[in-house]
Amino acid sequence: MPARTAPARVPALASPAGSLPDHVRRRLKDLERDGLTEKECVKEKLNLLHEFLQTEIKSQLCDLETKLHKEELSEEGYLAKVKTLLNKDLCLENGTLSLTQKANGCPANGSRPTWKAEMADSNRSPRSRPKPRGPRRSKSDSETMIEASSSSVATRRTTRQTTITSHFKGPAKRKPKEDSEKGNANESAAEERDQDKKRRVAGTESRASRAGESVEKPERVRPGTQLCQEEQGEQEDDRRPRRQTRELASRRKSREDPDREARPGTHLDVDDDDEKDKRSSRPRSQPRDLATKRRPKEEVEQITPEPPEGKDEDEREEKRRKTTRKKPEPLSIPVQSRVERKASQGKASAIPKLNPPQCPECGQYLDDPDLKYQQHPVDAVDEPQMLTNEALSVFDSNSSWFETYDSSPMHKFTFFSVYCSRGHLCPVDTGLIEKNVELYFSGVAKAIHEENPSVEGGVNGKNLGPINQWWISGFDGGEKALIGFSTAFAEYFLMEPSPEYAPIFGLMQEKIYISKIVVEFLQSNPDAVYEDLINKIETTVPPSAINVNRFTEDSLLRHAQFVVSQVESYDDAKDDDETPIFLSPCMRSLIHLAGVSLGQRRATRRTVINSAKVKRKGPTKATTTKLVYQIFDTFFSEQIEKDDKEDKENTMKRRRCGVCEVCQQPECGKCKACKDMVKFGGTGRSKQACLKRRCPNLAVKEADEDEEADDDIPELPSPKKLHQGKKKKQNKDRISWLGEPVKIEENRTYYWKVSIDEETLEVGDCVSVIPDDPSKPLYLARVTALWEDKNGQMFHAHWFCAGTDTVLGATSDPLELFLVGECENMQLSYIHSKVKVIYRGPSPNWAMEGGMDPEAMLPGAEDGKTYFYQFWYSQDYARFESPPKTQPAEDNKHKFCLSCIRLAELRQKEMPKVLEQLEEVDGRVYCSSITKNGVVYRLGDSVYLPPEAFTFNIKMASPMKRSKRDPVNENPVPRDTYRKYSDYIKGSNLDAPEPYRIGRIKEIYCGKKKGGKVNEADIKIRLYKFYRPENTHKSIQATYHADINLLYWSDEEAVVDFSDVQGRCTVEYGEDLLESIQDYSQGGPDRFYFLEAYNSKTKSFEDPPNHARSPGNKGKGKGKGKGKGKPQVSEPKEPEAAIKLPKLRTLDVFSGCGGLTEGFHQAGISETLWAIEMWEPAAQAFRLNNPGTTVFTEDCNVLLKLVMAGEVTNSLGQRLPQKGDVEMLCGGPPCQGFSGMNRFNSRTYSKFKNSLVVSFLSYCDYYRPRFFLLENVRNFVSFRRSMVLKLTLRCLVRMGYQCTFGVLQAGQYGVAQTRRRAIILAAAPGEKLPLFPEPLHVFAPRACQLSVVVDDKKFVSNITRLSSGPFRTITMRDTMSDLPEIQNGASAPEISYKWRATVLVPEAAARVALPAHPQGPYPQVHERAGGCRMRHIPLSPGSDWRDLPNIQVRLRDGVITNKLRYTFHDTKNGCSSTGALRGVCSCAEGKTCDPASRQFNTLIPWCLPHTGNRHNHWAGLYGRLEWDGFFSTTVTNPEPMGKQGRVLHPEQHRVVSVRECARSQGFPDTYRLFGNILDRHRQVGNAVPPPLAKAIGLEIKLCLLASAQESASAAVKGKEETTTED
């Protein structure tokens, strides 16, 4: 049976022109009304027309075809003769069917006609086969030639010209019975519409045939190469015969056999005059395409033409039912159910889009324009014959060991191509061999010793294989990988591919070299993040051998599966105590982003990339002081053993997913874990899983669990109480008072001593109380009072807190107690026994004892009843502070309780009080001053109020809420917008709260109680309202170029409760200032000014009235000065003016480019004399901005070791700081080294002991600075179940430092980004422990979850401004709207401002004094697809990759992108409104991933819809920033597909520049960076935002001022006492 061919799309049947009689014409029309199916109608028409073809013409056509096959007639001559015959007897009257196409010949995605494929068994080509594969029937060359000729079709890629008679061969196929019945049932109903449709199609074809007659002459090309679309402009005489011939051929073929299927590679549009005529020619000496023996006889079923636009969808559906046959076994997925047409709307029903056909062997799409066919070399022979050629022999007959056949022969192989059994060129590295798909190759074999890759001296071979395995044998000592194939007969080292196969093989070489880059990069950078890996890939110059200009992120994502597999293979050879490098942060991101399948079988590749293990560069072993070392090796050892035991018990359960191939493998029986198993003769004690069966999926999951803490903190109670259980009453029978009563007060008789069971107890002693629950430890308390009343013999207990009840948990010293603010009255009978609690204060020489052997806290305390305490512990905020120095008065010693006094002071402080009364009018008492929380408020003061305290007469313009998203219209251009199921956009300020309302106090009054006393609980304030710019009728646009502290006076008044007042601020009339507005704004916190008044009735701005000025201005000009009338300004400055504060000598460890130092300098508290930074570019940037600082670029461990050894200078002669020199120590030690492990076992503990955190704590212990600050990522407080936090605080407490921790949001301190940072503050004994700074700006609530959960207890910082703040949020517009427009990749060092920005915030005032050019923009360069994607991201807020259109785009280098194919049903997202599929991989259907489904060079990255369902649809990737929003956390390399996500400029098609990132961090434009673009990005991304550092510095400054004031007061008091004594 001849092979079936692909019919052209069947047009309305054309009859021969004038040669047919009228009755025949009528009969042709009647056939269309006889109720026949479409196929039957076509068959009858063909039979009718065949009667009018003259016999001699048929004979002549057959003779011409025979001559063409025998090459006695050229193709040009054949076409000319056929044209003559056809023009003589046949004339086509309908023309060619016109079909629209895209530039590459592929219909738009979703608009493809219905495809169905039916696969039939085909005979294989003759060849010698290895025995395991089994014999196959061979065909003669004549049979093959007949099949090739009978199945030839006009195509772009075949090498033979289509013949005419071949279209009339073969019987017509009958339609299945069920289809025929359905067709008959619907035929009569659609009869009239079919007739109208045929007439319209015929007219269209006629017009198209007249307009599209341009076919180029056949062009001679290399066999097997892809032919591009032909150009217009050849001679008309040469084009017309060929076009007419092809039209007739397609029509005759359609009439003869409409069911014939397309051959692979056949383009299925009839109107392809500009493409199909280009055929591959060959020299006459070259044999015909022998690969056709392997090509399928049937691969694609008949294609139904798509009606012209405007046709009824019902017609298309009916046509498809008539002409489409059902395939017995679909190649891909079941077709989705059709969408029913709504009768009320009268619209067409949505037609589901079916899959394009695929090759059943290699899985490639048959309509892919890049699909190529194999062309064998000239005179090629099969493999056995080739191997016997003498040219391949390296031995002669005299060789004594010639006849040994222990191993397969090895040869070099060049000019090779690899193809499947159907002749499609295909890669070998996509898993086809692993799936037992037979792949063959052809080319030129050479002897193993040959080095010349040319074809000279080689033996041409064809159909070698099938390939049993392919392998990589490392590299050739340079950049080229050695790759080979193994067959049943020999092994072949590959040299150079054929020109046709070079693009495919180039990708294979590219992925191998990228794997080499990744493995070598991870060897030295195991803690690198994804952006660092992309930086490495993009900055590596590709070797010339692989013909790639540059590596990109798309290159890495394209080969991600292969790269991860190679990294896994590298990890297979690791030592047991080594951490797998595939668990590094960058590899986990790559695995998630690209959807890599872990644990796949890799046995088919004999060897992997052999990269020599390189000793990882990094910090040396941690240099620790003895105190720090003792903490880790003594107090934590028991916890380590406990965790190790838990690990061993749970390893077997945690190491299996049961799905991947690694888990399903049997135990190897050879590794250390297997040898310990009982079944392999071991003891079975270790209970470890086989090292070869450790599931990679679970390993990645466990590593991800600690990657980032969740934003949503569970609702847990704050540990404000000890939650002591019920106490157990003791049987104390003998309780008696000793001595006389001390005092009698309120029915209480106080005593000083008591005897309990012959044990004397007096006030001030400590006792233990047994809990009712025996599993709990003893409760300990200090007896502060003893008395007797009606309740019996009582005592007042001031409780101690055990270390395990603090944030320290199990890391605390078991003998250490902490004072807390809790006390209780109890009966003496509850006392268990007397204990001893010693206060251990700091030694007089504490600061100089650093680094020495630590003394025992309680030498000889082994009786179980002796404890010690150093600090007061605040359970609300986890603050360890020195105990208060309050001394009891002489008359209060018998009942003096520190807890009661502190609580009373706190209540007294929080209670509102009236200080000065003015008058009483109508039952109201008017006042001039009141106080609350230690702040005094007077008439004329300005105050903060919550946003709900009062409203404005102008209706507030609420933040613009985005309208509800309309249904996604996927008809014009398919997009993935449907994935945006949530309206939340990361980086949006839509939910940001309003800042405080501000008012000036006009009156203060309150009512009276019944007794005539002032009712201080009901104080009211009448005030004038201040408008902010956004509160006026100009709304938010008024803030674009206005200072953030600008207000407008208003005569509107409001009355508020004093309890609503949130604090005091300063508001001045700008014209009354004695300094510039900028100096005034920077002169202190909470400063505002106004220049105009706002009239809400007229919506106009006016001059402020006289009473708007501060009351103190009445004295202006009389020598009183400005300060007298404005006490709120002068009061905070008085202590600072009176006390000169020296700056702290600071050592900045891990300084980076100097963000912390810059903030502290702005706060005016420090002078950074030393800095340590190992990374040279950051160290150079620090030097540029701090020329007076000694910057060490050495390992911090080396420097500390030198100092501890008594060295004064380092190897470079730089002077080292000595003990006593450092007054403040600050830094942010990296902690990635132990961030990837889920449990704290002995291996991770060992790594933690050598981490930089331990080194930093040793610096603190040695130098003993006055203040200590540790900054780190927010997750620092959660690492290892908060164990890192606990150990850090434990070390500080053991050193004697007061300390606390908290999480701060940098966006609340004046930067346009969300950046949560963990801060640990510590103060030396005698200093005041700083509070955390109150927020200055409102910020998005989602980003302000700052609680920390430790051991199921929630801790918060001392911050009280939780719902609002003094200033509005800083936006992207504030940050960078004045910067000039720059292009992608611009690198000019200086660019002029677009316009000069005003002072937006006090922290950014440095912009005003800038030169005309800010330091370079330096945006990241993104070429090819990345830059093109940026240009297609819409400018609307919230846009990201899901808004990319699925279109073809020409890149700058001329390459045209492919459209992304959606060929699978997505079970989660369903189908589109048009019925189109939404899945890009078989995993969307719940199956395993198919590597053949991967797509490349698409505008929409294939990996994103592939893995989107598992990762929140990758929201934000390729995301555009919003002018009124903020940055995500600024990272070290802004990549559109990186962690930060939204990095595209709001209006320009590029990522944000270095200067824009620096501004988002709060760096002034005068701050200089060093190095290339990526170095600068890294410097900015790793820095602490200077505004945040400044806010912390100001809090430290307040502590210094308070200490200075106390010292001054003590000195004055001492002087007065001395004077009195004198």
Curated annotation (Swiss-Prot):
Composition bias, Basic residues: 126-137, 720-731, 1115-1125
Catalytic activity: a 2'-deoxycytidine in DNA + S-adenosyl-L-methionine = a 5-methyl-2'-deoxycytidine in DNA + S-adenosyl-L-homocysteine + H(+)
Residue segments, region DNA replication foci-targeting sequence: 327-556
Binding site residues for Zn(2+) 2: 668, 671, 674, 690
Basic and acidic residues bias: start-end ranges: 176-197, 207-222, 237-269, 276-300
Region (7 X 2 AA tandem repeats of K-G): 1114-1127
Subcellular localization(s) per the UniProt record: Nucleus
Residue spans, zinc finger CXXC-type: 650-696
Sites where the protein binds S-adenosyl-L-methionine: 1151, 1155-1156, 1173-1174, 1195-1196, 1582, 1584
Binding site for Zn(2+): 359, 362, 420, 424
Name listed for the protein in its UniProt record: DNA (cytosine-5)-methyltransferase 1
